């Protein structure tokens, strides 16, 4: 179940547009073997929430008739999981030319595994993260990532709560905040 499927007032990032912009960037650089390293989240009685980044990645790849199954991995949203998922790809001999990670922490773990397997970033494998964590600009090479506007989310969230409570609106309000691609040095044309 995706968060959007709940019948509640909600504010979320426009994950689909964000993922599409990252994947458009990679395909524009010539990449076809694009791995996805994501995480799983659960709510309540351990009900799996479908991550919007996962859904958008699959939709994009299917729409463009690009085979993603050998390059698709889901673990958790941690550094260690990023390392493990990337190593699984190497062990299965499914070596992508690019990696799209569901967050910057996973991307950093993947970058560690890439280096440990004697590949170079971006010469051999390009990497894109998500969230634009502060450290992402200072690692080597600086990580290309999707900027998630936390401040804007807070402002819009407060406005949404105010409007919903003061106007006694019965229908749930839903809003999406745009994200933007921040191009740094972890990707290259092939």
Label each PLM-derived region with a short phrase.
Residues 3-190:
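Bacterial carbohydrate/catabolite-sensing allosteric modules
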